[in-house]
Amino acid sequence: MTELWSNYGKLFEIWFDGGVLSQQNGGADILTLIQRLQPNSIAFQGPYGYPNLIRWVGNEEGNSPYPCWATADATTSADGVQKIKGLYGNPHGNYWCPGEADFTLRRNDSFQGGWFWRANEDHLIFSTDELLLKYETSVGRNTNMLLGLVIDKNGLVPDADVKRAKEFGDIIRKTFSKPIRKISGKGYELSIRLNKETNISRIVLSEDIAFGERVLKYKLKGLCNGKWIQLSEGSCIGHKRIEHFPTHSLSVCL
């Protein structure tokens, strides 16, 4: 660990697959080492007591449970000392420990679950529509998204994977970068008035998480053909909640 954390500059994230064996159970003093060498890195399932922790969401399919609160009643689920109760977090928890949804660009039935390369498996790369759905069920459910890319025998990400990763970014930007209307504010009710009836199938919600996660429940309604209809409802919003529902022609959203 000393070699890896000392020779490659500042690391954005350190991944502890399966967690960290605590000192009480015979493990090394990883906490002291990471605090000394990479104190600003994010640690996935890192040692208990480290402040920059994120937690697993329970699968490697980009499908976060909902709700998935960024706060929890303990800071890690895999150090042998503290255990988070379930995968949903706790809206009243004392620790900031957001979920991270990891998934691969290649399907789970490819070599080693899509985390490692094998020849002649380019056909197992997910389609852009499938990847967009994973984006909505990970980032759109208040979790960080980690996309696993394979490295081929030449030490490179294969061209097919590079192409699909770019297409993935393109479809995210196409879908979300130019919303029909944006609004922000305070209070118990916010509304968006559209100039004319408009077909809508997604609404993106976001809290200012500098103040924590304060919304515990919400409802979305729309005025459709002169009648109010409920579009969706939920609990956790956090940094991003993407509500995807059947297309409606709306003039006002609440």
Stretches found by the model and what they are:
Residues 1-248:
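Mature catalytic domains of secreted/periplasmic carbohydrate-active enzymes
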Residues 250-252:
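Extracellular Ig-like/FN3 beta-sandwich strand-entry sites
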